[in-house]
Amino acid sequence: MSVSTSVVKSMLQLTNYFGSNFTPKTETISSLAELWERHGSMIASMMSCDTREFGTADKFYEVIFRKIATTSLSFMTDSLEPKLAASGDSLEICKFYALFLEYMRKDHSGMLTRALEQASSENRVDTAVLLDMFLFFDNVYSESTADDWWACLRRDDEDQEASSGFRTPKRNNYSLTSLQTPTATARRLRTASSTARRSPIAEAVDSPTMKFMRSERELKQSKARIFGLEQMLGDLEDDKTKLSAENRTLKLSNSDLKSDIAKLKGIAEEAQFRAEELSCDLEAKKDEVHNILQQLNESRMTLRSEQRSLEEADIKKENLTAKLKTVTEDNGKLMKQARELRDLNDYEFARFRQQEQELTETLRATQDQMADLQEQLTGVEKIRASLKSENESLSASVEELSVASLRNKQDADNSKTMLSEELARFEETVDKLRQEKLEALSMANSRIDALRLEHSEREKMMKSTNARLQADLDEERNEKKRLMNLWNELNEKSLNVDKAVHKSNEEFQSMGSCLQNAKRQIEQLEVACKSKDDIIKFQEEQNKRAANLIKNEKAIRDQASAQFAEKLAILKNSLAEKENETVTLKENFASVVMKHKAELEEKELFLQSRVDLIQRLEHEVADLREKESAEIKKSTWMGERIKIFQQAPMRGSRIRCGSPDSLPDFLADNGPTITEEELRAQLATFPRKSIAPSVDDNEFDKGTPIGFKSNMYDGRESICSLDFFDRSSLQRSSMRSESIQLASPSSAGEFKQPFTPSGVTKERVGVLTARNEKVKPHLKCSYASEVGSTNSPSADEENIKKSKKKNRRDSIFSAFSSKKQ
């Protein structure tokens, strides 16, 4: 069957109405297959689903299925198929939408009612179909069955005809007389609505008197039945009160056991919580050990890196020493060049002196020619002015050279001081780093990075200073070349001056001044050479100091490496101790864990014993219920037997009593050989023994109802029969007030109060032992049962059977038999 078109139409109208009033508004749909895509988020929000965005139809219908399964409509979800609905099956989609509307009717009835009323007033939704569907759901709830709950969605015959087109049925040729329904006889049978078992003929034959007598007889039977039922009701009420009292005691004991179980559960939870805490502590200890090992590995790595960095620093120091050697070699070369320059200056000075002597001789020779050369003085003065300007330029250049040499000296001093400061700073930083590494190994990586950066910067600075020194040396060499060029130029100029002096006597004074200037320049050069010698000496001293510093630094490094090795050995020893401590901690923790496991196992065994005790109590309750049913039977039988013994004469009881323990039967057979006072005196000498039926504790019927004969208990019909009563001391102690008592004359005809032990005490045990020493019990299990020790050897029936049997005690009839003899 397919889905009803009216149902599909009304569902489409309603969902489009919901979509038009929903914020944000959704698009209208023309088929239910588009429901999940356009109205899925709206339906999910109306049903308060967690997921409200759907990429596929499978996800949408799966979410709606889970949501419906958590509501009160979960019993209808067995017939839903999310996969078929996702594939576009109209029946499955209608099922989902119908349950969605039912969910809205249950949880959001006000909103659904307002929407349906407004939609019906606007003629936008056919609400009749939906109301019929809701009525069908109500019928499903009343029938308490969910089979075919979607039957209201299927297409009926009228819908099929409407879908196939209406048409008039063809007229048949049957006559109306041939279609008459057959009827029964005019008179209905009397048994049609009667419940009597007698035949209707017997009812018709009976006379009114017979009917009256039958009704009277039935009335008497019903009265007798009512009377018996009332008596049974009274007995049952008494039994009910007894059982309710026992039930209350059992409930109290059950509540006590539950409280004990709750306490034990709390103890078990505390033990479990303690075990979890210990496991967490173990995990923390493991993490600490792991962290310590990781730190040890990191410290080893940092030590190796530090050793590598120290080796690299040694290599760099060796490079610096090599560079210093090259610098000293360059300084030696410069010293050699300075010596050569000084020798050259001495040679030139000697040559100038020789020239001066020659000039003096020529001066003397030319003094006579001074007058002649006065005219040429003006030209010589001009030449002199030019020479003065040149001398001034030369002096300026010499001053510049001196300033440059001073600057070079200062730069060299600064560079050396910087190198020394950098070496001292480097040593200080190395010492600080060593101390910091020994104090805190965790900061080694950052310090190493800082040292590397600083070392790289220092290398750059050293390279820059070396390059600057090399540039200064190159500049000094260039200046030397320039000075040599200047010296050559001076030589050339001196030669020109000599030529000019030779040419004219007026130029003698100018040449003298030039010589004086040259002398000054030579003196300045000598001073510069001396300063350079001092600089070289200072550099040599600095080199010696640097060598001494390097030696000291090497010694300090050796000492530091030795200290570092000692501290490393100490750290290794401490690490070994820590590892031993961790091993001991692990062993202690394992022992603690095993101890707690044992405690937990003991607690679990204790809880299991409590659970077993509860189960045993439940079994005892079931046994008590069964005993209750047996008690009802026995109470009825006992009531009948008591009535018989109360109403029947002694003769009848004598006929019925077949037990050898029956006292009336014995006296009737043998005659009263002794008087009543003697009998009472004899009975008073014996201890009182209570004999009563243990109806509460025995499940078997010990007697036979009236009118029946038992094959198992022949000859045991007497109420005083010993086999009728159990001889257990606990059962004797649990007898009620209706128990019969054979006692002394003072207590004859009275019921003995039952003994209800409040528990095994020291006094009770003493009383029992004293009694059993005087009169030993018939069964060995009686003492153990009364004391409550089920582990006693006398409580085992097999031990009782295997043990030596005792002689039976003399009964009350032994006295009569002895007197008779």
Swiss-Prot record:
Residues 162-180 have a biased composition (Polar residues). Residues 211-634 form a coiled coil. One of its GO terms (biological process) is gonad development. Keywords: Cell cycle, Cell division, Centromere, Chromosome, Coiled coil, Cytoplasm, Cytoskeleton, Kinetochore, Mitosis. It is found in: Cytoplasm, Cell cortex; Cytoplasm, Cytoskeleton, Spindle; Chromosome, Centromere, Kinetochore; Cytoplasm, Cytoskeleton, Microtubule organizing center, Centrosome. This is Spindle apparatus protein lin-5. The lineage of its organism: Eukaryota, Metazoa, Ecdysozoa, Nematoda, Chromadorea. Interacts with gpr-1; gpr-1 forms a complex with gpr-2 and GDP-bound goa-1. GO terms for cellular component: cell cortex; centrosome; condensed chromosome; cytoplasm; kinetochore; kinetochore microtubule; microtubule organizing center; mitotic spindle. The gene is lin-5. It comes from the Eukaryota. Residues 181-199 have a biased composition (Low complexity). Signal peptide: none annotated. Essential component of the spindle apparatus required for spindle positioning and chromosome movement. Acts to recruit or anchor gpr-1/gpr-2 complex to the spindle and cortex. Also involved, directly or indirectly, in cytokinesis and in the coupling of DNA replication, centrosome duplication and mitotic division. One of its GO terms (molecular function) is dynein complex binding. Residues 161-199, 736-758, 779-821 are annotated as: Disordered.
